[in-house]
Amino acid sequence: MFIGEWYHTIDSKGRITVPSRLRDLLPDGGYLTRGFDRNLMLYRRKDFERLTTRVQQLTSTKPENRQLFRHLFSGAVTAQFDKIGRVMVPPYLRDYARLSGEVTLAGAGNYLEIWSAAEWAASAEQRANSEMNGQQFALIDLAFTSAGGANDSAPDIGPASRA
């Protein structure tokens, strides 16, 4: 699982060093594509292939679905690491995410986000918004209780009841 934040730089050739603990999650490389917030998303191959399967089940007759297809797939590239653990970001993806100089790598569960440091800092207020966070967390059950009421079982994250 991709968790945590890392601060690095992108060099003039578009290469970003990815920490070894994150590279360990991507032994075969992955797929790099546009994110939804002027960032990039780096997926493990198996997760991107699952995403592709799910997205391609959507009908292409709806304009919003075609927009999603284009957003995710037209800019996607395979991502491989060089000998010293850097991933190459093509110019059009650097432009999309406004990457130059300082960058932030942010874990997002089953993928890694790559942000310009300035965009990441600008979005800090939104991430800290307690009202929005409350609404998002209301979508899942964070009680983590087992049937017997003990809190020592593995979490069962599912939709929260809407009573």
What does each model-found stretch correspond to?
Residues 1-8, 12, 22-78, 83-84, ...:
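Flexible "stalk/tail and boundary" regions
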